[in-house]
Curated annotation (Swiss-Prot):
Pfam families: KH_2, Ribosomal_S3_C. Coiled coil: none annotated. Binds the lower part of the 30S subunit head. Binds mRNA in the 70S ribosome, positioning it for translation. Residues 39-107 form the KH type-2 domain. This is Small ribosomal subunit protein uS3.
Amino acid sequence: MGQKVHPNGIRLGITKPWISTWYADKSDYASNLNSDWEVRKFLVEKLQAASVSKIVIERPAKSIRVTIHTARPGVVIGKKGEDVEVLRAAVSKLAGTPAQINIAEIRKPELDAKLVADSIAQQLERRVMFRRAMKRAVQNAMRIGAQGIKVQVSGRLGGAEIARDEWYREGRVPLHTLRADIDYSTSESHTQYGVIGVKVWIFKGEVLDGMLPQIEEPKQQQPKRKPRGK
């Protein structure tokens, strides 16, 4: 069977940036990596209702800067910024360094693979039919401006005895094209029949930045043929 490489991992440094951007010596690398994992785990559990897509961590000058990408910034910030201050203190304690929290709003959650996958998973937990949830997500993404989307669910769909997977695709999803901007993410739905896995691929277009501009060569005009007999 053919296996698929992770769409985000293969594009790191080409069209996708890393979600942890810092440099450390050998002595500090392991502790920083573990600290990143602890911070992400804490924030994901704390902000389950905030529609968090990703958490980007930077470490400038013996401090930590966390950028939370969310579709509901008001839930993260809280009344008069009180919740952000609580998060900042907790992150600073976990990392052991001064912390700064930034909030980035996601304007189009229908085009974010993580948010789409979480939405489908939540609908499955509310006993919405999986085909309806998949089709609704695909239609919303294409309506907002996606060039292609694929959604796959796996598990005991509809309470069936035998687990299976079903997928639905619309538009193009070119996984082999490295310049293709493909957002990929997964989620899990915990139902009474077991865990159902959700995968989402969203193709937003091709990234051409950094490539040399293609200049079309002027077409050479062919000389006009003289009419016969002259």
